Amino acid sequence: MLIFIVLIIIGMSGCEKVAVDNQASGDVFVKAIKDASGTTVYTAIHSVFSYNQMTTVTVQTPEGLTESLNGYDSNGNSFFNEPAESDFVGVPPTPGAYVYTVKFANNETKTYSNTLSVATLQPALITSLVKSANGDSVYIAWNAIASTDAYQLKISRGTTQVYYQPAFQDGSTPLKANLKLGLSKSALTSGVTGTYTFELTGLLFENSNYDYLQAISTSTKDIDL
C-alpha cells in the first residue's frame, strides 16, 4: 500500500503573502543520479524561498567558494541552482554549513544557513515500465531505496510535463522490498503518442517534519505510448 503525504519544501507554510519583516529560508541537499556508465554521481542542490521579494541570492560553501543562485521567476520569491551534467561528480558534496546571503527588494541583506550531512540516497533501480495486457494502464516497478522517507514521480513527453505525483510513502508493514505504481494511459497521454519519460525520485528529509531535504536521488526510464 502506498500512502500519499503532503510535502512542504523549505519549511515555510502558509496560504497567503503577509506584509512582514523580510524573512527567507535556505536548504541544501545532495542529489544523486546514474551517469552514462552506470556510476552514481552527486551534486549539491540549493533552494531559497521567501514570501518577500528577493533580488539576489548567493551561497558560500564550507570550502569558502561563492555561487550565485538563479531566480525561478520575476516575482523573486524563489532562487535555486540548476546543475549541469558536468556538475555531477563521483563523490558527494562537502558536508557542513552552507551560508546564504539574501538581498531583498528594499535593499536589506540577511544571511541564513543550512547544514549538509554526509547522508545520501542511491538512485532507485526501476525494474520494469510496461503497459498492461489490455493497453489501458502503465505500470512502473522499482526496488525500494534503503533509508528513503518518500518518493515522487514526474512524467514528461519531451519537454512537456504531463503528470506529477507529490511525495508518497510505502505504508506496508513490514516495508516492501519492491514497489509498483499503476497509472491510466489515457490520463497520461490524452491520445498523444510518443516517448514518455518516467522520473522517479527518492526523498530523504532532515527530520520528521518533512520540511527540509537532506538528500534525493533520481532514476529515469522511457516508454513509448
Could you say what each language-model-derived stretch is?
Residues 7-37, 225:
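Bacterial Sec-dependent N-terminal signal peptides
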Residues 32-38, 130-136:
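Short, solvent-exposed loop/linker segments at the N-terminal edge
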Residues 59-88, 152-191:
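Recognizes extended acidic, P/S/T-rich segments that occur
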Residues 46-48, 136-148:
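Conserved aromatic anchor
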Residues 34-68:
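Post-signal-peptide N-terminal segment of Sec-exported extracytoplasmic proteins
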Residues 102-104, 186-217:
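Beta-strand-rich modules
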Residues 111-122, 208-225:
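Short beta-strand elements
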Residues 24-27, 120-130:
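Proline-enriched interdomain boundary motifs that mark the N-terminal boundary
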